[in-house]
Amino acid sequence: MDIKDYMQNLGCRARKVSRVLARAGAEEKNQALEMAASFIEKESQALVEANHKDLAAGRSKGLDEALLDRLTLTEARIAVMAEGLRQIASLPDPVGAISELSYRPSGIQVGRMRVPLGVIGIIYESRPNVTADAAGLCLKSGNAVILRGGSEAFHSNQAIACCIHQGLEQAGLPQEAVQVVETTDRLAVGALITQEEHVDVIIPRGGRSLIERISQEAKIPVIKHLDGICHVYIDDRADLDKAVAIAVNAKCQRYGVCNAMETLLVAREIAAEILPMMGEHYCSAGVELRGCPETQGLLPHIEPATEEDWYTEYLAPLLAIRIVAGLDEAIEHITHYGSHHTETIVTEDFTRARRFLTEVDSSSVMVNASTRFADGFEYGLGAEIGISTDKLHARGPVGLEGLTSQKWIVLGNGHIRE
């Protein structure tokens, strides 16, 4: 198989059917999603059997238990995957929505219409449920999609795609609307991210090395985030009960997610009061702490934090703690070491909260709330394709609207420009 020719063929077919999807109605798209969900439930045993092939191959390659868990499809996870497609079907269709329509002095009406991006390439690792989630979101937003999953989930992804294709067929939509790359050759990634004539945007979901490679080599716009180095700053005017609850939840609810806190900043004026309490909570949760010299003075049992720690997304029960003079130093630290993902201030001071919201340059900035809320579902977007820390085109959780663009529309009645 010539990989370049194969990928060009996928791109060409995707571009062709993207025009069909752009004019498809919400009823057709929703029917396809509902039918795909039904086929996923109906074929659950076939999905489990395909997944067993991937798990056996993974074990033979020595994949660790965490990776194997992300790879595993159970009956319960398959049911959640099907329900996810139904939830996407229940969301409002963004395509065709007109906004900001107004009359101009010339008499014309000018507004903006939401339209699909066209063809989306999604490159991801391990989790086979991404195949269904990504296909569903792209379909509902009127986009054709080319999915390149991780080689470790090859059989699972193909089986899920088969169910989605059946759903598309039942709804009278082309199966090429969702194409899964049928090769594990790594050259396929390079061929996909350089197809500027066929593919409009690339969305990578995976580890830092994958995203860095795609960012450097792609000839197509990329929607991405590299790291989730999220901060919680406890101000000296914070409610201590709120501060403890937020800082514990932000770190301990789930470790291996991009919106978990990785660095805790504490105002010097309240550090002696709150850090011993925080230390007890983290110790009981099994979180390893690393701190600046001042923090070590209050928590002598912890390890020293290095310069590298401030730049690290742990995705593990590890936390770096730094005592800062106040809000200015906290913002300076976040600006220098942060990844523009999610930051929170805990304070009862309205002016300081407004300053934090205004001056911190991240995709989500919060007041008195856990960083774990940085999520499309929690924001009312429904499902999300990922979180973007870029400033163009989408920023923060990327849901259906983030997979569309806008074009200007002008309505006249024989108007000519004088």
UniProtKB/Swiss-Prot annotation:
Gene that encodes the chain: proA
Originating species: Nitrosococcus oceani (strain ATCC 19707 / BCRC 17464 / JCM 30415 / NCIMB 11848 / C-107)
A Gene Ontology BP annotation from the UniProt entry: L-proline biosynthetic process
Pfam annotation, one family: Aldedh
Keywords on record: Amino-acid biosynthesis, Cytoplasm, NADP, Oxidoreductase, Proline biosynthesis
Pathway note: Amino-acid biosynthesis; L-proline biosynthesis; L-glutamate 5-semialdehyde from L-glutamate: step 2/2
PROSITE patterns noted in UniProt: PROA
NCBIfam families named among the record's database cross-references: PRK00197.1 (NF001221), proA (TIGR00407)
Cell location: Cytoplasm
SUPFAM superfamilies, A to Z: ALDH-like
Name of the protein this chain belongs to: Gamma-glutamyl phosphate reductase
GO cellular component, one term: cytoplasm
Stated role: Catalyzes the NADPH-dependent reduction of L-glutamate 5-phosphate into L-glutamate 5-semialdehyde and phosphate. The product spontaneously undergoes cyclization to form 1-pyrroline-5-carboxylate.
Catalytic activity: L-glutamate 5-semialdehyde + phosphate + NADP(+) = L-glutamyl 5-phosphate + NADPH + H(+)
E.C. number(s) listed in UniProt: 1.2.1.41
Superkingdom as given in the UniProt entry: Bacteria
One Gene Ontology MF term: NADP binding
Organism classification: Bacteria, Pseudomonadati, Pseudomonadota, Gammaproteobacteria, Chromatiales
Keyword flag NADP: yes
Main location: cytoplasm
Record-stated family: Belongs to the gamma-glutamyl phosphate reductase family.
